[in-house]
Amino acid sequence: MCTSIRHDWQLPEVLELFNIPFNDLILNAHLIHRKFFNSNEIQIAGLLNIKTGGCPENCKYCSQSAHYKTQLKKEDLLNIETIKEAIKKAKVNGIDRFCFAAAWRQIRDRDIEYICNIISLIKSENLESCASLGMVTLEQAKKLKTAGLDFYNHNIDTSRDFYYNVTTTRSYDDRLSSLNNISEAEINICSGGILGLGESIEDRAKMLLTLANLKKHPKSVPINRLVPIKGTPFENNPKISNIDFIRTIAVARILMPESYVRLAAGRESMSHEMQALCLFAGANSLFYGEKLLTTPNADCNDDKNLLSKLGVKTKQAVFFDS
């Protein structure tokens, strides 16, 4: 199994990985994981929604879209003091990366000062900072970099071929353009996707291929399991199997050996045994807290119990050089 860092993967190679017998696949992924990381150490990230609901995008999985009638209550931007308290609480809980998100299509110039203030608060607690605020221009990204932003999250969600089954209000190229702006501004990329949208195995392969063939691999690759939201077009989507989810984690690890592969949304429905297999297959990051944006997350005490049983330690914040 190749352990070099590559940016020239071909689709047949990735599909072949998905077809490897399960035990062989996760073993190979685990060995690659051990070469690049301490396999008994995990990164813990926290996530705060600073603006909830009313998003103009029509992503068919999202409770925050203004296009669908969900039970979500729209909320305006949080005030800085509330955010400051959330950051301090995250620090006490052992989180080493603090992420904040807003239900925006894109960053507006008028909000840059507010965003930079949040970044400064995060950095003052000696935490890694990550923002997920929609599309971003190069000029805006440079301002965030100057403010000290370590990461910017902008998921591609799925493959280019399947993308328009998920959203039509922004293009796949829009997403890739933002990723390019983030990279040019020398901010580390956080980008992944969602499993269970109705995509095929080939779509999963193409999604990971797109990420693995970027000029720089994303430093973080969140893999989400669809949490069906009542009122959205995907509320009745069938659940992706545990085996298929773990396979995708393993392939992500093989394609992007140096990236943090994060268990993101949908983890609250996973047993300890499944999460342990995900960690064995190469996942080494997870979100900690009661909810992720608007969806439930695994119980904090349950997470502590899981990591204790597995003998897995949490890592301290590392500030990457771009």
UniProtKB/Swiss-Prot annotation:
Pfam families: BATS, Radical_SAM. [4Fe-4S] cluster binds at C55, C59, C62. The gene is bioB. The keyword Calcium does not apply. Pathway: Cofactor biosynthesis; biotin biosynthesis; biotin from 7,8-diaminononanoate: step 2/2. The lineage of its organism: Bacteria, Pseudomonadati, Pseudomonadota, Alphaproteobacteria, Rickettsiales. It catalyses: (4R,5S)-dethiobiotin + (sulfur carrier)-SH + 2 reduced [2Fe-2S]-[ferredoxin] + 2 S-adenosyl-L-methionine = (sulfur carrier)-H + biotin + 2 5'-deoxyadenosine + 2 L-methionine + 2 oxidized [2Fe-2S]-[ferredoxin]. Catalyzes the conversion of dethiobiotin (DTB) to biotin by the insertion of a sulfur atom into dethiobiotin via a radical-based mechanism. It is an enzyme of class 2 (transferase). Keywords: 2Fe-2S, 4Fe-4S, Biotin biosynthesis, Iron, Iron-sulfur, Metal-binding, S-adenosyl-L-methionine, Transferase. It comes from Ehrlichia ruminantium (strain Gardel). [2Fe-2S] cluster binds at C99, C130, C190, R262. PANTHER family: BIOTIN SYNTHASE, BIOTIN SYNTHASE, MITOCHONDRIAL. One of its GO terms (biological process) is biotin biosynthetic process. Its EC number is 2.8.1.6. Residues 40-258 form the Radical SAM core domain. This is Biotin synthase. InterPro entries: Aldolase_TIM, BATS_dom, Biotin_synth/BioAB, Biotin_synthase, Elp3/MiaA/NifB-like_rSAM, rSAM.
